């Protein structure tokens, strides 16, 4: 469901990060910036210094530019979705931007070339790390994922969930998910690191990204919390 394009590349100064994807059907791109330790961090206003270029190169030689814009405009544009996480002081600690394409079919000999140009000013000492993933699906009838923000207090049913995001640590009974007659902690659906994107979460940030495993993809999932939690879900 998630195809790695650019993975955990450190941002130092002005830098260009590039990755290629082929043999996939892409509905969305997920751009994730994780802040490292430090005293100053990327703020939303810094995203206008980061630019994304997405080009589809067909085997025939045809090239089609799908996206060419700075990240701040993408995060704020109405046809896109963006989310931020914060530390206790309210400082932005991580960014995720989800770009909706509809459906882009990339053949085995085609290339989706993603170039993310980042800028880190002298005042930013958090050593940010960037990743870009293709959100892929074999769903028919042009089903489109949706990006939804909820404050969950108690429980809430998400229809056909494939991924859940939260700014709260997914540990123990603080965070439960139920699908069918099965109720488990989030950790039962996560592994120990954010690597191959099937049942993983980002453990080095205040922002957690849960990608449900294959047994739950496309199922109705109930998220259960003992207190109000900010939940972001991708559903179809």
Task: Give, region by region, the residue ranges found by the protein language model.
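Beta-strand-centric surfaces of beta-sandwich/beta-rich domains
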Residues: 1-236
